[in-house]
Design a protein with these regions (language model features):
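Short, solvent-exposed loop/turn and secondary-structure capping segments
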Residues: 34, 50-56, 121-124, 165-170, ...
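Mobile gating loops/cap/lid regions near enzyme active sites that modulate substrate access
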Residues: 232-339
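Secretory targeting and sorting signals
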Residues: 1-32
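Solvent-exposed loop/turn segments at secondary-structure junctions
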Residues: 46-50, 114-120, 160-165, 231-235, ...
Protein backbone atom coordinates (compact mmCIF):
# COMPACT_ATOMS: atom_id res chain seq x y z
CA UNK A 1 0.00 0.00 0.00
CA UNK A 2 1.26 3.57 -0.68
CA UNK A 3 2.83 6.15 1.57
CA UNK A 4 1.40 9.20 -0.20
CA UNK A 5 -2.16 10.24 -1.00
CA UNK A 6 -1.34 11.16 -4.59
CA UNK A 7 -0.57 7.59 -5.69
CA UNK A 8 -3.77 6.50 -4.03
CA UNK A 9 -5.82 9.11 -5.85
CA UNK A 10 -4.48 8.09 -9.26
CA UNK A 11 -5.74 4.58 -8.69
CA UNK A 12 -9.10 5.73 -7.39
CA UNK A 13 -9.77 7.81 -10.48
CA UNK A 14 -9.32 4.65 -12.55
CA UNK A 15 -12.38 3.13 -10.89
CA UNK A 16 -14.53 4.87 -13.49
CA UNK A 17 -12.73 3.28 -16.45
CA UNK A 18 -13.37 -0.22 -17.79
CA UNK A 19 -10.97 -1.77 -20.28
CA UNK A 20 -10.60 -4.69 -22.64
CA UNK A 21 -12.71 -6.64 -25.06
CA UNK A 22 -14.70 -9.80 -24.56
CA UNK A 23 -15.40 -12.51 -27.05
CA UNK A 24 -18.80 -12.84 -28.69
CA UNK A 25 -20.74 -15.97 -27.89
CA UNK A 26 -20.62 -18.58 -30.63
CA UNK A 27 -23.83 -19.41 -32.53
CA UNK A 28 -25.93 -22.10 -30.94
CA UNK A 29 -28.46 -24.59 -32.24
CA UNK A 30 -32.13 -23.84 -31.76
CA UNK A 31 -34.51 -26.09 -29.84
CA UNK A 32 -38.07 -25.79 -28.60
CA UNK A 33 -38.43 -24.54 -25.00
CA UNK A 34 -38.07 -27.47 -22.66
CA UNK A 35 -36.29 -29.61 -25.24
CA UNK A 36 -32.75 -28.52 -24.43
CA UNK A 37 -30.79 -28.88 -21.19
CA UNK A 38 -32.08 -26.98 -18.19
CA UNK A 39 -30.32 -23.67 -17.66
CA UNK A 40 -29.91 -20.90 -15.11
CA UNK A 41 -28.75 -17.59 -16.60
CA UNK A 42 -27.22 -14.52 -14.98
CA UNK A 43 -27.38 -11.11 -16.62
CA UNK A 44 -26.29 -7.60 -15.75
CA UNK A 45 -23.16 -5.98 -14.37
CA UNK A 46 -19.93 -6.62 -12.49
CA UNK A 47 -21.57 -7.66 -9.24
CA UNK A 48 -22.90 -10.79 -10.93
CA UNK A 49 -20.38 -11.25 -13.77
CA UNK A 50 -17.62 -12.16 -11.34
CA UNK A 51 -15.44 -9.05 -11.16
CA UNK A 52 -12.74 -9.53 -8.45
CA UNK A 53 -13.09 -13.30 -8.51
CA UNK A 54 -9.31 -13.42 -8.84
CA UNK A 55 -8.88 -12.79 -5.12
CA UNK A 56 -9.14 -14.88 -1.95
CA UNK A 57 -9.12 -12.09 0.61
CA UNK A 58 -6.68 -9.16 0.70
CA UNK A 59 -2.95 -9.16 1.49
CA UNK A 60 -0.35 -6.41 1.82
CA UNK A 61 2.26 -8.68 0.24
CA UNK A 62 2.81 -7.49 -3.34
CA UNK A 63 4.88 -10.36 -4.71
CA UNK A 64 4.29 -13.95 -5.70
CA UNK A 65 0.91 -15.37 -4.79
CA UNK A 66 0.32 -12.49 -2.35
CA UNK A 67 0.15 -14.99 0.51
CA UNK A 68 -2.18 -17.20 -1.49
CA UNK A 69 -4.76 -14.52 -2.25
CA UNK A 70 -3.98 -14.13 -5.97
CA UNK A 71 -5.48 -16.97 -8.00
CA UNK A 72 -3.88 -15.59 -11.17
CA UNK A 73 -0.37 -16.50 -9.93
CA UNK A 74 1.18 -19.20 -12.10
CA UNK A 75 4.32 -19.71 -10.06
CA UNK A 76 6.32 -17.28 -12.16
CA UNK A 77 3.92 -14.62 -13.43
CA UNK A 78 0.27 -13.52 -13.31
CA UNK A 79 -2.34 -14.77 -15.76
CA UNK A 80 -5.82 -13.34 -15.09
CA UNK A 81 -7.27 -15.67 -17.74
CA UNK A 82 -6.85 -18.47 -15.20
CA UNK A 83 -9.82 -16.85 -13.46
CA UNK A 84 -11.61 -14.78 -16.10
CA UNK A 85 -10.86 -16.83 -19.20
CA UNK A 86 -11.10 -14.92 -22.47
CA UNK A 87 -13.03 -12.12 -20.73
CA UNK A 88 -10.05 -11.04 -18.60
CA UNK A 89 -9.76 -7.27 -18.50
CA UNK A 90 -13.18 -6.92 -20.09
CA UNK A 91 -16.41 -8.50 -18.90
CA UNK A 92 -14.38 -10.32 -16.22
CA UNK A 93 -16.63 -13.37 -15.97
CA UNK A 94 -14.88 -15.38 -13.29
CA UNK A 95 -14.88 -19.08 -12.61
CA UNK A 96 -16.36 -18.29 -9.18
CA UNK A 97 -19.09 -15.95 -10.48
CA UNK A 98 -22.45 -16.28 -8.76
CA UNK A 99 -23.97 -18.72 -11.23
CA UNK A 100 -20.77 -20.78 -11.39
CA UNK A 101 -20.77 -21.06 -7.58
CA UNK A 102 -24.41 -22.08 -7.27
CA UNK A 103 -23.79 -25.80 -7.55
CA UNK A 104 -25.76 -28.27 -9.69
CA UNK A 105 -28.97 -26.24 -9.93
CA UNK A 106 -29.25 -26.80 -13.70
CA UNK A 107 -27.49 -28.65 -16.49
CA UNK A 108 -26.15 -25.39 -17.92
CA UNK A 109 -24.99 -22.41 -15.85
CA UNK A 110 -24.70 -19.47 -18.22
CA UNK A 111 -23.16 -16.10 -17.38
CA UNK A 112 -24.07 -13.29 -19.79
CA UNK A 113 -23.27 -10.46 -17.36
CA UNK A 114 -20.46 -8.02 -18.09
CA UNK A 115 -18.45 -5.77 -15.82
CA UNK A 116 -19.38 -2.14 -16.42
CA UNK A 117 -22.69 -2.93 -18.11
CA UNK A 118 -25.63 -0.55 -17.85
CA UNK A 119 -29.27 -1.13 -18.64
CA UNK A 120 -28.78 -0.13 -22.28
CA UNK A 121 -26.39 -3.07 -22.59
CA UNK A 122 -29.25 -5.36 -21.56
CA UNK A 123 -31.91 -4.06 -23.97
CA UNK A 124 -32.26 -5.73 -27.37
CA UNK A 125 -30.49 -3.92 -30.20
CA UNK A 126 -33.83 -3.56 -31.98
CA UNK A 127 -35.08 -1.62 -28.96
CA UNK A 128 -32.10 0.71 -28.65
CA UNK A 129 -29.77 -1.63 -26.79
CA UNK A 130 -26.05 -1.15 -27.20
CA UNK A 131 -23.28 -3.66 -27.75
CA UNK A 132 -20.60 -3.58 -25.06
CA UNK A 133 -16.99 -4.76 -24.96
CA UNK A 134 -17.36 -6.52 -28.27
CA UNK A 135 -20.55 -8.36 -27.34
CA UNK A 136 -24.14 -8.01 -28.48
CA UNK A 137 -26.70 -6.65 -26.00
CA UNK A 138 -27.38 -9.23 -23.32
CA UNK A 139 -31.05 -9.68 -24.24
CA UNK A 140 -30.00 -10.63 -27.77
CA UNK A 141 -27.54 -13.14 -26.32
CA UNK A 142 -30.34 -14.47 -24.14
CA UNK A 143 -32.42 -15.17 -27.25
CA UNK A 144 -29.85 -17.68 -28.45
CA UNK A 145 -29.55 -19.22 -24.99
CA UNK A 146 -33.34 -19.51 -24.64
CA UNK A 147 -33.60 -21.25 -28.00
CA UNK A 148 -30.95 -23.85 -27.20
CA UNK A 149 -31.82 -24.51 -23.56
CA UNK A 150 -34.73 -24.97 -21.20
CA UNK A 151 -34.18 -21.80 -19.17
CA UNK A 152 -35.64 -22.10 -15.69
CA UNK A 153 -34.30 -19.02 -13.91
CA UNK A 154 -32.76 -15.70 -14.92
CA UNK A 155 -31.00 -13.64 -12.24
CA UNK A 156 -30.49 -9.95 -13.00
CA UNK A 157 -28.16 -7.45 -11.31
CA UNK A 158 -28.31 -4.05 -12.99
CA UNK A 159 -28.60 -0.33 -12.27
CA UNK A 160 -25.47 0.35 -10.25
CA UNK A 161 -23.48 1.62 -13.22
CA UNK A 162 -26.42 3.71 -14.40
CA UNK A 163 -26.34 5.41 -11.00
CA UNK A 164 -22.59 5.97 -11.28
CA UNK A 165 -21.62 3.73 -8.38
CA UNK A 166 -17.93 3.75 -9.37
CA UNK A 167 -17.97 7.55 -9.50
CA UNK A 168 -19.49 7.66 -6.03
CA UNK A 169 -16.78 5.39 -4.62
CA UNK A 170 -14.03 7.39 -6.30
CA UNK A 171 -15.45 10.69 -5.06
CA UNK A 172 -15.88 9.49 -1.50
CA UNK A 173 -12.38 8.03 -1.41
CA UNK A 174 -10.73 11.12 -2.85
CA UNK A 175 -12.68 13.30 -0.40
CA UNK A 176 -11.09 11.24 2.39
CA UNK A 177 -7.57 11.12 0.97
CA UNK A 178 -7.17 14.56 -0.57
CA UNK A 179 -9.93 17.01 0.26
CA UNK A 180 -10.67 16.11 3.87
CA UNK A 181 -14.38 16.61 3.26
CA UNK A 182 -17.48 14.44 3.28
CA UNK A 183 -19.05 13.10 0.11
CA UNK A 184 -22.42 11.89 1.30
CA UNK A 185 -24.28 15.18 1.08
CA UNK A 186 -23.34 15.93 -2.53
CA UNK A 187 -23.53 12.31 -3.64
CA UNK A 188 -26.95 11.75 -2.12
CA UNK A 189 -28.23 14.59 -4.28
CA UNK A 190 -26.64 12.98 -7.34
CA UNK A 191 -28.32 9.66 -6.60
CA UNK A 192 -31.69 11.26 -5.92
CA UNK A 193 -31.56 13.09 -9.24
CA UNK A 194 -30.89 9.88 -11.18
CA UNK A 195 -32.68 7.10 -9.37
CA UNK A 196 -36.19 7.43 -10.81
CA UNK A 197 -34.89 7.21 -14.37
CA UNK A 198 -32.55 4.37 -13.51
CA UNK A 199 -35.29 2.31 -11.91
CA UNK A 200 -37.49 2.86 -14.94
CA UNK A 201 -34.69 1.44 -17.06
CA UNK A 202 -34.26 -1.51 -14.68
CA UNK A 203 -37.95 -2.21 -15.13
CA UNK A 204 -37.51 -1.97 -18.87
CA UNK A 205 -34.66 -4.49 -18.61
CA UNK A 206 -37.10 -6.95 -17.04
CA UNK A 207 -39.57 -6.24 -19.84
CA UNK A 208 -36.85 -6.88 -22.42
CA UNK A 209 -36.02 -10.24 -20.86
CA UNK A 210 -39.69 -11.19 -20.87
CA UNK A 211 -40.07 -10.16 -24.51
CA UNK A 212 -37.14 -12.35 -25.50
CA UNK A 213 -38.49 -15.33 -23.59
CA UNK A 214 -41.96 -14.90 -25.08
CA UNK A 215 -40.52 -14.69 -28.58
CA UNK A 216 -38.61 -17.91 -27.88
CA UNK A 217 -41.88 -19.67 -27.09
CA UNK A 218 -41.80 -19.63 -23.31
CA UNK A 219 -44.96 -19.14 -21.28
CA UNK A 220 -44.83 -17.00 -18.14
CA UNK A 221 -44.85 -20.08 -15.91
CA UNK A 222 -41.98 -21.80 -17.70
CA UNK A 223 -39.25 -19.73 -16.05
CA UNK A 224 -38.58 -17.21 -13.29
CA UNK A 225 -36.82 -13.87 -13.12
CA UNK A 226 -35.00 -12.88 -9.93
CA UNK A 227 -33.97 -9.24 -9.60
CA UNK A 228 -31.23 -8.86 -7.02
CA UNK A 229 -29.80 -5.91 -5.11
CA UNK A 230 -26.21 -5.07 -4.20
CA UNK A 231 -24.20 -6.12 -1.14
CA UNK A 232 -22.25 -3.45 0.71
CA UNK A 233 -18.46 -3.90 0.32
CA UNK A 234 -17.67 -1.54 3.23
CA UNK A 235 -18.74 -1.77 6.89
CA UNK A 236 -20.42 0.69 9.18
CA UNK A 237 -17.94 2.91 11.00
CA UNK A 238 -18.56 1.07 14.28
CA UNK A 239 -17.53 -2.17 12.57
CA UNK A 240 -14.33 -0.81 10.99
CA UNK A 241 -11.14 -2.14 12.56
CA UNK A 242 -9.20 1.01 11.60
CA UNK A 243 -9.71 4.50 13.01
CA UNK A 244 -10.60 7.27 10.60
CA UNK A 245 -7.59 9.44 11.55
CA UNK A 246 -4.17 8.78 10.09
CA UNK A 247 -3.50 6.69 6.99
CA UNK A 248 -4.30 3.15 8.09
CA UNK A 249 -7.58 3.02 6.17
CA UNK A 250 -5.76 4.07 3.00
CA UNK A 251 -2.35 2.43 3.33
CA UNK A 252 -3.27 -0.74 5.20
CA UNK A 253 -6.97 -1.47 5.04
CA UNK A 254 -7.88 -0.32 1.55
CA UNK A 255 -11.07 1.37 2.78
CA UNK A 256 -10.37 5.13 2.55
CA UNK A 257 -13.69 6.57 3.70
CA UNK A 258 -14.81 8.85 6.53
CA UNK A 259 -17.04 7.37 9.23
CA UNK A 260 -19.98 9.51 8.16
CA UNK A 261 -19.58 8.48 4.53
CA UNK A 262 -19.19 4.80 5.44
CA UNK A 263 -22.38 4.93 7.47
CA UNK A 264 -24.18 6.73 4.67
CA UNK A 265 -23.11 4.13 2.11
CA UNK A 266 -23.93 1.17 4.35
CA UNK A 267 -27.16 2.39 5.94
CA UNK A 268 -28.58 4.86 3.40
CA UNK A 269 -27.28 4.36 -0.13
CA UNK A 270 -27.23 0.56 -0.31
CA UNK A 271 -30.67 0.28 1.38
CA UNK A 272 -32.11 3.02 -0.85
CA UNK A 273 -31.04 1.16 -3.97
CA UNK A 274 -32.27 -2.16 -2.57
CA UNK A 275 -35.66 -0.76 -1.61
CA UNK A 276 -36.15 0.80 -5.01
CA UNK A 277 -35.15 -2.43 -6.76
CA UNK A 278 -37.63 -4.28 -4.59
CA UNK A 279 -40.28 -1.86 -5.81
CA UNK A 280 -39.36 -2.60 -9.42
CA UNK A 281 -39.57 -6.33 -8.76
CA UNK A 282 -43.03 -5.91 -7.25
CA UNK A 283 -44.23 -3.75 -10.14
CA UNK A 284 -42.98 -6.27 -12.70
CA UNK A 285 -44.13 -9.38 -10.85
CA UNK A 286 -40.71 -10.96 -10.40
CA UNK A 287 -38.88 -12.26 -7.34
CA UNK A 288 -36.50 -10.05 -5.39
CA UNK A 289 -33.27 -11.20 -3.74
CA UNK A 290 -32.01 -8.68 -1.19
CA UNK A 291 -28.23 -8.88 -0.79
CA UNK A 292 -27.64 -5.70 1.23
CA UNK A 293 -26.50 -7.69 4.30
CA UNK A 294 -24.86 -10.61 2.50
CA UNK A 295 -21.32 -9.45 3.33
CA UNK A 296 -22.06 -8.23 6.86
CA UNK A 297 -18.87 -8.68 8.92
CA UNK A 298 -16.96 -9.79 5.80
CA UNK A 299 -16.58 -6.35 4.24
CA UNK A 300 -13.24 -4.66 3.57
CA UNK A 301 -11.81 -3.50 6.94
CA UNK A 302 -14.54 -5.22 8.97
CA UNK A 303 -13.56 -6.01 12.57
CA UNK A 304 -14.93 -9.54 12.24
CA UNK A 305 -12.56 -10.37 9.36
CA UNK A 306 -8.80 -10.35 8.88
CA UNK A 307 -6.33 -9.63 6.13
CA UNK A 308 -4.28 -12.53 4.84
CA UNK A 309 -0.65 -12.64 5.98
CA UNK A 310 2.21 -15.11 5.98
CA UNK A 311 0.80 -16.56 9.20
CA UNK A 312 -2.93 -16.03 8.52
CA UNK A 313 -3.85 -18.02 5.39
CA UNK A 314 -6.85 -17.31 3.16
CA UNK A 315 -10.04 -18.67 4.65
CA UNK A 316 -13.72 -18.18 3.87
CA UNK A 317 -14.32 -18.22 7.62
CA UNK A 318 -11.91 -15.38 8.49
CA UNK A 319 -10.87 -13.46 5.36
CA UNK A 320 -12.61 -10.46 3.83
CA UNK A 321 -15.16 -11.25 1.13
CA UNK A 322 -14.73 -8.05 -0.89
CA UNK A 323 -11.82 -6.58 -2.82
CA UNK A 324 -10.13 -3.60 -1.24
CA UNK A 325 -9.05 -0.42 -3.00
CA UNK A 326 -5.48 -1.23 -4.01
CA UNK A 327 -4.37 2.36 -4.04
CA UNK A 328 -0.88 1.56 -5.32
CA UNK A 329 -2.32 -0.40 -8.26
CA UNK A 330 0.26 -3.16 -7.84
CA UNK A 331 -2.24 -5.99 -7.52
CA UNK A 332 -4.57 -6.68 -10.41
CA UNK A 333 -6.93 -4.09 -11.90
CA UNK A 334 -8.47 -1.18 -10.05
CA UNK A 335 -11.85 -2.05 -11.58
CA UNK A 336 -11.88 -5.07 -9.26
CA UNK A 337 -12.07 -2.77 -6.21
CA UNK A 338 -15.17 -2.82 -4.01
CA UNK A 339 -16.59 -6.01 -5.53
CA UNK A 340 -17.26 -9.39 -3.93
CA UNK A 341 -14.09 -11.46 -4.28
CA UNK A 342 -13.97 -15.23 -4.85
CA UNK A 343 -15.30 -15.90 -1.35
CA UNK A 344 -17.99 -13.28 -1.74
CA UNK A 345 -19.02 -14.72 -5.09
CA UNK A 346 -19.18 -18.22 -3.65
CA UNK A 347 -21.45 -16.85 -0.94
CA UNK A 348 -23.70 -15.15 -3.48
CA UNK A 349 -23.75 -18.38 -5.47
CA UNK A 350 -25.13 -20.08 -2.38
CA UNK A 351 -27.78 -17.36 -2.20
CA UNK A 352 -28.72 -18.07 -5.81
CA UNK A 353 -28.97 -21.78 -5.13
CA UNK A 354 -31.17 -21.12 -2.12
CA UNK A 355 -33.62 -18.87 -3.95
CA UNK A 356 -33.65 -21.26 -6.88
CA UNK A 357 -35.32 -23.70 -4.48
CA UNK A 358 -37.94 -21.12 -3.43
CA UNK A 359 -40.41 -20.69 -6.31
CA UNK A 360 -42.25 -17.65 -4.95
CA UNK A 361 -41.74 -14.71 -2.61
CA UNK A 362 -38.95 -12.25 -1.89
CA UNK A 363 -35.95 -13.21 0.20
CA UNK A 364 -32.95 -11.65 1.93
CA UNK A 365 -29.66 -13.55 2.01
CA UNK A 366 -27.29 -13.32 4.97
CA UNK A 367 -24.18 -15.05 6.24
CA UNK A 368 -23.58 -16.85 9.51
CA UNK A 369 -20.80 -15.23 11.54
CA UNK A 370 -17.66 -17.33 11.88
CA UNK A 371 -18.55 -19.79 9.14
CA UNK A 372 -17.60 -20.11 5.50
CA UNK A 373 -19.75 -19.53 2.47
CA UNK A 374 -21.87 -22.57 3.23
CA UNK A 375 -23.39 -20.60 6.11
CA UNK A 376 -25.54 -18.41 3.86
CA UNK A 377 -29.26 -18.49 4.59
CA UNK A 378 -32.48 -16.85 3.44
CA UNK A 379 -35.10 -14.91 5.39
CA UNK A 380 -38.41 -13.52 4.20
CA UNK A 381 -38.14 -10.03 2.77
Amino acid sequence: MPSTPHRALRALLALCTAAGLASVAAPVAHAAPGAGPTAVVTMGDSYISGEAGRWLGNSLTNSGSRNGTDRAWTGSTYDPSRVYGSTAGGCDRSDTAEVKSAGPIASSLINLACSGATTENVFRASQGGQAYKGEAPQADQLAAVAAANDVKLIALSIGGNDLGFADIISTCASDYIVWYSYCHDDQQAVVDAKIDGVMADVGRSVDEIRAVMTAAGYAAGDYRIVLQSYPSPIPRSADNRYGESGWSRTNTGGCPFWNADSDWARDSLVPQIADRLKGVAAAKGVQFLDLRDALQGREVCAKASRQVTSTVPPSAATSEWARWIDSQSTQGLVQESMHPNAYGQQALGKCLALINAVPTGNRSCRNTAGTGTSGMYLTAN
